[in-house]
């Protein structure tokens, strides 16, 4: 014994600092709070020993803070890689000399350094202090009960379930009472835990200290507390130890109690029992020190935490599973695992997991990952208003913990309202309604009523909501429940689930509240055996408990807990129930119980999990929760305060509630009743920091006197019986400090309070009066201050709101002004942050950084307030009568652009969003606009990369914990496999939650027979290359692909073993027209009309011939012929392209790119305009070709329905995110890369030597190539490139490709100009595979074709784009918006040189390019495209089938066919069949009708018209032509041709196009 005492104090006190500095800071904070309050001196009245002034040898507070900050900065520095570079200083040679203007540098230049202190707000400090600080000690002196020890469980192992009395020998009825309470587990954010220490060491813990040992992070937090009060009562402890050494009491009899004098003087009920265990102390202590040193050397997160390699068996005999359970559930020792069973936890849901029965605990574990970013369910519902009973229809989306509803399902950033399910109580179908399609969701704030379209839909919504509520009430990514066997009252079998054995375990939560919790477990296998083992364990511990407690039996044979709670012989528990969620009965879904109501206050540690939710608070608008602080996890147990609460759902208050502490029970209601509206004070009233010191803790059993009164304060007694629980469900009123009167009546016994409560009633009037007087005094002082100052404050607030402005609450990169630093008020900042979180239903981890007043411009400018936090960009309208809200995650923002405002004198800001249209804002002052833009840009990288990495680490840690436990379990219990429930009759509406929710199975849609697949495309090399990659993969799938394109690509295609088919046309001529005239300009149309009529006819004819015999057609829509060929052949038809071609509000058409962001309406109209112009220019020839060669009638853009055709976009979703308004059959698959730089290709020695020399000279190396385009003056461009390379001081690999083709003018070739000679800094090559070459350079500059852009982005290098025509402007804009390159809008030596220098020196651009490159490399676009083809094949086939059926019905409905007409007649203008000229007017399949006035020759200039073009269409054609009426004028077939084309034109008809 003499050697054990120094061991416990010496090494522990002198141990190095914990690797988790948060725990040390919390301890220091707790100590400082004690010292800061003289009235709360730690000295206790009585002869007990005084508390030492210095309990432990710890580093100072400043050292701990410095250590923590250095560790945090080190971690962030490693993750961030300095994403925010300071504004770059250009060399003098590249500075603007006043002769050129460059517009691209405003956005593309990197901004200031990244903000590193996102979580350093007042709430972070509150969480840091609240995690371990005992807030009770602020309001009263130290209680002697806090000095108690708990018995060691090291030697308490069972040999098997059949051995009785083992645990009884290790525990005594006189064990010291500690304030053990149910603890919320925290998710393990750290990598390792510290061994609990030698079992034979006399240790002192904080009250209920083992409750902190739920996860390894808690172990580190608790390690700093283990020696806090070790030196206290050393003499007494030594004496007690001697008694225990000399005496060997009978296991069945309790130890003799201490005398009354000893009890009162020491504040201790029984003596401390020290149980010896095997092993020596020194090796264990050395292992503790080694473990701590190992933890300090590790980073903050390590997935090897559960690997077991660095751990040693504490006792040397336990198995691997026991060690894992010790790590996960933080047992003191590795307890022997008696049995393990797969089971289901029954609450609102059925949760699949495993039960582990150890010597001293029953543990339940289930992996339940958070799904904060997944949409659980979406669809239309009707919702009634708060005051209006009418049901309005909205689009609902259940994502994360929030149920949001929208007026427009495509505007998911603008919710019409939100329901925060973290405060959810339950979701249930209303049984009163016969239809069964009404359901409600209850929260602490209010009850919401919904109406679904069907009863089935309502049940599905309820089940999804129950799952989300369950997940939101669990802290972390796993459900953990640890029940000490000594706390179990009884175990009953309950028939609740058919084909399963269900047991109900009633547990005393802790020995302060004596709440009785119920846990229901169902076993679909091994059920009888499991329940028998549990009963044997409970029977082993019950004799000792009954003998020690002598508690009388209540009704129904259950114990009535608490009759003798005031006695020193009170039954106590060494620890309480530990759980990540509170127990809820499965039969109590709609029960007005505190447990059922979701009173699950969560806790987490901001120091170790800066992005997690710190606490789960009650709704700030509920009066009943005014005095309810959030439940924080620290040494005191379940809540920071154990004072009672008012439940809004319960009935009248009982004696136990009213007389527990009148100052709390009444004053909280008084404060809450002052205002019904949500305010900042109400939002923050749940936080311990904002509680008045007059709130005192209720007296406990071992406290002799209350602090302020000096009168006896016996403990509160709360009685529960099994009959009560069975009648009303497990109300668990003791856990919230109240029992309803209806509960006392249902109990069947008298509701008279105990003598202790009666004694307390005598003091109630005086205490109530004192509390009320204190409240009045406080309110009077507050009102006087309000009259003096607040009136002016409100005026200032309102005037400031309308005047506009800005304010920085947090200070990223020094954005705060000096005035803001001087006027900074932490309390005001906390209030503003809480209001912000309440406005947008955001978690408390959301840190408000800045706020601005401005206008959001949608249809009309709307005034409001802009909020920027560490994760979201939000807007809230301030005009009365408006409710516009914007909630935009920062990770969805690509960039922000500064532009002119829509109104004169206003400055505009454009927020570019992934897959969504831009959002425009206006500011009254340009400086506020600039400040807002800089703040957003500085926050983007941290929100996009750091936050995601943190979430990934947390998820990986939970998975590692699960995998380690499964591995150990499978080794010891390989035959215990879980079974799914066949039928849940007792809880038929309870949804099941599996370990990992299975995704929809990926079915194999591959056709059984190989197909002949034809790919039709025209254009440049970049248009053909993706199809080669696709066809190579189709060959591997067993199909027979064929590429139909220009003849110049024949050898290239056939070299890959792919069949080739030719089409006519010269792509270089088309490119020349586009470059010289622009894409689809008036000059382009005029020249194309005059020169490309014949080219289009040849293209259509050759394409029809080349596609014969195909089973599937995939076409680039620029080829124009494929959709008609597929219709004629009756084969499925897909489209595939390299740029957006489908109508959307997110991006403008790639051929009609504006000079600035124009918004969603403009973007959409560009597609409509292009489709109509493109069809109008080609309709005449296409319809004539359809009639002559395909045997099809005339068609129109509406009848073709191109927007319903399945589409494959072969670019990356990371580069062009799919817009939210894309249909299901439109898929962005990823790039179709053709890697040709493999082993077969060897780079020239000249190229490798040039690259090596550039690296040796430490020069930046760039690639420049404009290979697929034609330039008017190649020599001039070459000279500009040479000058820019020399000016930027880089080395260049130049590839010209097609750019040296000579253009022709009027058939005469222009004379070639000799290219200038290249300096040694430039190496010219003819060609090289991009997949090899781009990996050798630091940046790439090219024309911006889709394939080349994808190759450079995949390499992860910055990209400079100089667009020439077509989609190149679109991809240049995308590269600029993503921040991975430069859009070179102005070409010249100076501009190009500056772009080269910035691309090779901007670390921010390089980091973003590398991240994007990794995302693209992780994709497999070709495989994704093939799977999409298989999935949509039937859909495409059905579209063609419907069209052919329509053609047949048209043929049958023709009234007067033309005699002798032949569908495939070679004549152009004579003898057309009837089906070609009858446009079915009664076509219900059409999307819309388009009537174009005038004639085809208005555009083409041609004066000749075919007979098929002389049909007139009137409005009467829209009515029922097929129902027996005479054909309308426009639908009649002209049996005899008119005398002249002008005769029909003179009739003034409207021609159908």
From Swiss-Prot:
Instruction: Report domain PH positions.
Output: 374-470
Which top EC class is named for this enzyme in its record?
transferase
What is this enzyme's catalytic activity, as reactions?
Answer: a sterol + UDP-alpha-D-glucose = a sterol 3-beta-D-glucoside + UDP + H(+); ergosterol + UDP-alpha-D-glucose = ergosteryl 3-beta-D-glucoside + UDP + H(+)
List the keywords (alphabetical): Autophagy, Cytoplasm, Glycosyltransferase, Lipid biosynthesis, Lipid metabolism, Membrane, Protein transport, Repeat, Steroid biosynthesis, Steroid metabolism, Sterol biosynthesis, Sterol metabolism, Transferase, Transport
Q: Compositionally biased, Polar residues: which spans? A: 1-10, 25-36, 651-662
Localization in the cell: Cytoplasm; Preautophagosomal structure membrane
Q: Which GO terms describe its biological process?
A: autophagy; carbohydrate metabolic process; lipid glycosylation; protein transport; sterol biosynthetic process; sterol metabolic process
Enumerate composition-biased segments (Basic residues): 223-232
Q: Which residues cross the membrane?
A: none
Record field: compositional bias (Acidic residues)? 1466-1488
Q: Which Pfam families match?
A: EryCIII-like_C, Glyco_transf_28, GRAM, PH
According to its UniProt entry, the function of this protein is described as: Sterol glycosyltransferase responsible for the glycosylation of ergosterol to form ergosterol-glucoside.
**UniProt family annotation:** Belongs to the glycosyltransferase 28 family.
Q: This chain belongs to which protein, by name?
A: Sterol 3-beta-glucosyltransferase
* Protein source organism: Neurospora crassa (strain ATCC 24698 / 74-OR23-1A / CBS 708.71 / DSM 1257 / FGSC 987)
Q: What is the lineage of its organism?
A: Eukaryota, Fungi, Dikarya, Ascomycota, Pezizomycotina
């Amino acid at each position: 014994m003499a050697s054990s005492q120094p061991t416990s104090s010496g090494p522990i006190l002198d141990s190095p600092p914990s690797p988790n500095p948060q725990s040390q800071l919390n301890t220091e904070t707790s100590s400082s709070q004690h010292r800061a309050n003289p009235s709360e001196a730690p000295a206790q009245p009585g002869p007990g020993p005084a508390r030492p002034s210095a309990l432990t040898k710890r580093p100072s507070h400043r050292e701990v803070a410095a250590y923590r900050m250095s560790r945090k900065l080190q971690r962030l520095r490693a993750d961030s890689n300095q994403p925010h570079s300071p504004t770059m200083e250009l060399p003098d040679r590249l500075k603007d000399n006043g002769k050129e203007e460059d517009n691209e540098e405003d956005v593309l230049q990197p901004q200031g350094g990244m903000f590193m202190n996102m979580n350093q707000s007042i709430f972070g400090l509150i969480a840091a202090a609240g995690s371990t600080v005992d807030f009770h000690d602020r309001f009263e002196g130290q209680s002697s009960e806090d000095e108690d020890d708990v018995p060691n469980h090291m030697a308490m192992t069972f040999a098997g379930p059949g051995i009785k009395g083992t645990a009884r020998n290790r525990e005594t009825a006189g064990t010291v009472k500690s304030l053990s309470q149910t603890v919320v587990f925290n998710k393990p954010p750290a990598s390792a835990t510290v061994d609990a220490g030698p079992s034979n060491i006399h240790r002192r813990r904080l009250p209920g200290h083992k409750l902190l040992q739920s996860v390894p992070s808690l172990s580190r937090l608790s390690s700093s507390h283990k020696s806090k009060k070790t030196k206290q009562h050393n003499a007494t402890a030594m004496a007690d130890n001697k008694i225990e050494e000399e005496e060997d009491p009978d296991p069945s009899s309790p130890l003799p109690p201490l005398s009354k004098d000893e009890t009162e003087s020491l504040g201790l009920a029984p003596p401390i029992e020290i149980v010896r265990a095997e092993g020596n102390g020194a090796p264990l202590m050395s292992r503790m020190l080694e473990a701590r040193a190992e933890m300090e050397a590790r980073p903050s997160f390590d997935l090897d935490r559960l690997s077991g390699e660095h751990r040693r068996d504490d006792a040397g005999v336990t198995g691997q599973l026991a060690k894992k359970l010790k790590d996960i559930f933080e047992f003191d020792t590795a307890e022997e695992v008696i049995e393990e069973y797969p089971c289901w936890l029954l609450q609102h849901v059925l949760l699949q997991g495993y039960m582990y029965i150890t010597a001293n605990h029953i543990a339940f574990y289930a992996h339940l990952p958070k799904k904060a970013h997944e949409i659980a369910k979406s669809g239309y519902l009707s919702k009634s208003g708060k005051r209006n009973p009418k049901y309005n229809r909205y689009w609902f989306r259940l994502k994360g913990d929030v149920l949001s509803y929208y007026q427009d399902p495509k505007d998911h950033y603008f919710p019409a309202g939100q329901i925060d399910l973290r405060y959810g109580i339950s979701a249930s179908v209303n049984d009163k309604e016969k239809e069964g399609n009404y359901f409600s969701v209850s929260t602490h704030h209010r009850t919401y009523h919904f109406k679904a379209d069907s009863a089935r839909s309502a049940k599905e919504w309820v089940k999804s909501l129950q799952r989300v509520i369950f997940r939101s009430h669990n802290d972390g990514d796993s459900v953990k429940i640890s029940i000490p066997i000594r706390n179990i009252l009884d175990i009953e079998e309950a028939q609740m689930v058919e084909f399963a054995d269900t047991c109900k375990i009633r547990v005393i939560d802790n020995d302060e509240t004596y709440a009785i919790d119920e846990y229901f477990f169902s076993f679909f296998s091994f059920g009888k055996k499991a329940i028998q083992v549990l009963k044997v364990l409970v029977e082993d511990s019950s004799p000792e408990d009954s003998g020690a407690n002598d508690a009388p039996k209540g009704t129904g044979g259950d114990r009535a807990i608490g009759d003798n709670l005031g006695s020193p012989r009170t039954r106590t528990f060494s620890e309480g129930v530990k759980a990540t969620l509170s127990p809820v009965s499965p039969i109590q879904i709609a029960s007005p119980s505190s447990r059922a109501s979701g009173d699950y206050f969560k806790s987490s540690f901001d120091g170790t999990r800066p992005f997690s939710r710190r606490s789960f608070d009650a709704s700030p608008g509920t009066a009943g929760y005014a005095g309810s602080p959030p439940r924080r996890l620290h040494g005191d147990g379940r809540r920071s305060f154990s004072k009672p609460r008012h439940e809004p759902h319960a009935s009248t208050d009982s004696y136990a509630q009213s007389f527990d502490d009148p100052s709390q029970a009444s004053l909280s209601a008084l404060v809450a009743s002052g205002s019904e509206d949500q305010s900042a004070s109400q939002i923050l009233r749940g936080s311990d920091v904002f509680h008045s010191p007059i709130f005192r803790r209720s007296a406990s059993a071992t406290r002799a006197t209350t602090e302020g009164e000096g009168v006896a304060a016996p403990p509160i007694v709360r009685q529960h019986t099994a009959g009560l629980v069975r009648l009303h469900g497990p109300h668990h009123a003791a856990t919230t400090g109240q029992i309803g009167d209806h509960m006392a009546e249902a109990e069947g016994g008298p509701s008279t309070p105990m003598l202790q409560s009666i004694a307390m009633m005598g003091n109630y009037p005086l205490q109530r009066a004192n509390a009320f007087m204190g409240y009045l005094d406080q309110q009077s002082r507050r009102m006087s201050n309000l009259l003096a100052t607040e009136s002016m404050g409100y005026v200032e607030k309102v005037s400031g709101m309308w005047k506009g402005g800005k304010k920085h609450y947090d200070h990223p990169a020094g954005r705060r002004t000096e005035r803001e630093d001087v006027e900074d008020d932490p309390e005001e900042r906390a209030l503003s942050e809480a209001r912000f979180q309440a406005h947008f239903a955001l978690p408390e981890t959301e840190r408000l950084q800045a706020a601005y007043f401005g206008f959001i411009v949608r249809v009309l400018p709307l005034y409001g307030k802009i909020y920027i936090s560490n994760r979201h960009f939000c807007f809230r309208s301030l005009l009365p009568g408006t409710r516009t809200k914007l909630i935009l995650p920062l990770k969805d923002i690509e960039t922000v652009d500064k532009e002119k405002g829509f109104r004169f004198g206003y400055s505009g800001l454009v927020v570019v969003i992934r897959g969504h249209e831009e959002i425009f804002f206006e500011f009254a002052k340009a400086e506020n606009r600039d400040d807002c833009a800089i703040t957003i840009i500085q926050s983007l990288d941290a929100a996009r990369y750091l936050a995601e990495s943190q979430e990934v680490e947390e998820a990986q840690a939970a998975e590692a914990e699960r995998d380690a436990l499964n591995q150990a379990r499978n080794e010891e219990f390989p035959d215990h496999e879980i079974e799914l429930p066949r039928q849940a009759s007792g809880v038929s509406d309870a949804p099941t939650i599996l370990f990992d929710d299975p995704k929809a199975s990926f079915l194999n849609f591959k056709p059984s027979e190989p197909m002949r697949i034809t790919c039709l495309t025209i254009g440049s090399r970049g248009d053909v290359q993706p199809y080669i990659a696709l066809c190579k993969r189709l060959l591997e799938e067993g199909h027979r692909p064929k590429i139909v394109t220009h003849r110049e690509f024949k050898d290239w295609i056939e070299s890959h073993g792919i069949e080739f088919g030719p089409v006519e046309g010269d792509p270089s001529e088309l490119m020349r027209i586009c470059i010289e005239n622009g894409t689809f300009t008036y000059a382009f149309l005029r020249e194309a009309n005059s020169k490309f009529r014949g080219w289009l006819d040849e293209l259509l004819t050759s394409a029809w011939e080349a596609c014969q015999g195909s089973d599937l057609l995939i076409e680039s829509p620029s080829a124009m012929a494929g959709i008609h060929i597929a219709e004629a052949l009756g084969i499925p038809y897909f489209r595939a392209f390299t740029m957006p071609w489908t109508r959307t509000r997110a991006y403008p058409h790639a051929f009609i790119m504006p000079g600035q962001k124009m918004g969603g309406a403009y973007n959409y109209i560009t597609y409509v305009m292009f489709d109509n112009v493109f069809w109008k220019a080609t309709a005449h020839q296409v319809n004539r070709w359809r009639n002559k060669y395909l045997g099809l009638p005339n068609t129109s853009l509406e009848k073709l329905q191109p927007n319903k055709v399945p589409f494959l976009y072969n670019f990356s979703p990371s580069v062009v995110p799919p817009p939210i308004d894309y249909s299901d059959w439109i898929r962005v698959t990823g790039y179709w890369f053709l890697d040709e730089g493999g082993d077969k290709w060897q780079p020239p020695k000249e190229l490798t030597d040039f690259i090596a020399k550039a690296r040796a000279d430490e020069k930046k190396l760039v690639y420049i190539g404009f290979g697929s385009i034609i330039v008017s003056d190649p020599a001039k461009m070459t000279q500009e490139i040479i000058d820019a390379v020399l000016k930027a001081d880089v080395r260049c690999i130049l590839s010209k490709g097609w750019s040296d083709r000579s253009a022709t003018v009027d058939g005469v070739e222009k004379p070639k100009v000799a290219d200038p000679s290249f300096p040694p800094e430039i190496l010219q090559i003819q060609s090289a595979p991009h997949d090899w070459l781009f990996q050798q350079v630091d940046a790439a500059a090219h024309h911006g074709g889709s394939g080349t852009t994808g190759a450079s982005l995949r390499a992860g290098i910055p990209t400079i784009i100089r667009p020439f025509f077509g989609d190149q402007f679109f991809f240049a804009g995308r590269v600029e918006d993503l921040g991975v390159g430069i859009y070179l809008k102005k070409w010249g030596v100076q501009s190009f040189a500056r772009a080269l220098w910035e691309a090779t020196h901007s670390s921010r651009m390089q980091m973003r390019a590398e991240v994007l490159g990794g995302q693209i490399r992780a994709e497999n676009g070709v495989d994704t495209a093939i799977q999409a083809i298989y999935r949509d094949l039937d859909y495409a086939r059905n579209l063609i089938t419907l069209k052919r059926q329509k053609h047949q019905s048209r043929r049958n409905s023709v009234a007067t066919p033309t005699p002798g007409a032949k569908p495939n007649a070679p004549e152009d203008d004579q003898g057309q069949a009837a089906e070609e000229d009858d446009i079915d007017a009664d076509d219900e399949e059409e999307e819309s009708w388009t009537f174009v006035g005038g004639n085809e020759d208005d555009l083409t200039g041609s004066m000749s018209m075919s007979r098929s073009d002389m049909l007139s269409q009137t409005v009467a054609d829209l009515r029922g032509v097929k129902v027996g009426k005479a054909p309308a004028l426009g639908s009649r077939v002209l049996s005899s041709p008119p005398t002249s084309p002008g005769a029909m034109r003179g009739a003034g008809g409207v021609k159908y196009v």
